[in-house]
Amino acid sequence: MRIMESVRDHRKTAVRSCHEIGKSFIAAEVIGWFIATRRIGDAFVVTSAPTAKQVAAILWREIGRVHGRGDLPGRVTATEWKAVPVLPDGRPGKEELVGFGRKPDDYDMTAFQGIHAPEVLVVFDEADGMPPELWEAADSLMANDDSKMLVIGNPDNPQSQFREVCKPGSGFNTIGVSAFDSPNFT
């Protein structure tokens, strides 16, 4: 709950945690909440992880589960969420993309260009493995005050951008999740 409240209340949230606590599940829950609480067409979710396999087989698998359990709009595929907006006159519009998962090339600064919506949520799963260039590309999506960023992972690499944003004064609201907070730890 603290993580969702942080995303609600802060533009940027960093969650540092141990292994095996369900980080991808937490990210998927936040994504489901974000899409469900905004008008289709006004919100867009961009997700990434260090590998394409992590994007599809881990994060988007969890997003699909969240979507399937809830009364959430649209449909979820292996790496996309599509939904039908309601037009001002009450008729359904044309189905549109409201979120996707991608693993761009590590040095592709244009990876997330062309994404425009009044509210954008950027999610990095396993953020410790994301290269600096993709952090810069994602930051370019934070152009308006209603955009949000959630980065979640294990800050194991002392040279990573994720380790830096977990430090005080980084501009991120940082939440630590201990192994002792997880039911997976016995």
Named regions from a protein language model:
Residues 1-186:
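Phosphate/NTP-binding elements of NTP-utilizing enzymes
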